[in-house]
């Protein structure tokens, strides 16, 4: 499959989340509402056939009124894809990031602060009448604002929040009603805006810090599994993000993909590892070849830590795995020197060994 050119309406990335300009918080009928984001184009986003297919499938569920859920391992571009799909809806976007400390009040809203009122009445000069009142101020949080205004909610890594936090979502998706706590005073529920849509992302349950999703919520979500990008997409993204020549970027992409296929690691290398190597190599002007010891060291720094993931390993096992990694570097980033010059310099093996710490 050949790589595609950048899409006409890709989404920008803000602090790793992909969004555009933000509208400031406002007060609506005495309520404070959080800001929303408006997606805007970014040249670094690349749309391939794989992305178009996922986007089409996701929009099909959203247009029918179902909440969408992108599920897959880290590094597969779920968040960027979710924001790209949200941009196609043409509505402001509100983002929530899952967290173990997140509670229902953080989604819906709560009473914040106090409003004081003091009246001193001296209509009769020798009589003073004093009246004081103090009322709390209700603040809408992200879910309430999205439901009330018809925004698109992107709930990133939602399974990092505790399952009981999401009970409020059940009525939103089934009855299209958001039930507010008694402290809201003004209203006990709101009808969900017809244009409200929700997009969720999550990692597999075996990841650290991930909770199992409650069955009642999972049953309401339209789940699409997202796998690692195909080679065409990785190559297009690497070239667009780093400005590196396609031939050089292809070597790095193939190296990382081969390392991932080997299974000889404890932390899966993703497209982020490819971008890391390609970006640094482009900035430093390195040759994407085993001939350049600095490039070999760069690959070692970016990939070797994933083999052991901070765990202690025996010296023999460590050397064996490092040798396997260097063999992959030799295979996918071979020497570009002429044979005679390569023999004089010790060949590719000399370049590898010269990079060993």
UniProtKB/Swiss-Prot annotation:
GO cellular component: cytoplasm; gas vesicle
Primary location class: other
GO terms, biological process: gas vesicle organization
Chain spans, region Disordered: 22-43
Protein EC: 3.6.4.-
Database matches in Gene3D superfamilies: P-loop containing nucleotide triphosphate hydrolases
Pfam families: AAA_5 (PF07728)
Binding-site residues for ATP, renumbered to this chain: 72-79
Record's subcellular location: Gas vesicle; Cytoplasm
Polar residues composition-biased segments: 22-36
Reactions catalysed, as given in the entry: ATP + H2O = ADP + phosphate + H(+)
Protein keywords: ATP-binding, Cytoplasm, Gas vesicle, Hydrolase, Nucleotide-binding
Keyword ATP-binding listed: yes
GO molecular function: ATP binding; ATP hydrolysis activity
Function recorded in the entry: An ATPase that functions in gas vesicle formation. A minor component of the gas vesicle, also found in soluble extracts. Gas vesicles (GV) are hollow, gas filled proteinaceous nanostructures. During planktonic growth they allow positioning of the organism at a favorable depth for light or nutrient acquisition.
Entry-linked PANTHER family: MAGNESIUM-CHELATASE SUBUNIT CHLD, MOXR FAMILY PROTEIN
Subunit architecture: Forms homodimers, probably interacts with other GV proteins including GvpA.
Similarity remark: Belongs to the CbbQ/NirQ/NorQ/GpvN family.
Protein name, as recorded: Gas vesicle ATPase GvpN
Naturally occurring in which organism (per UniProt): Ancylobacter aquaticus
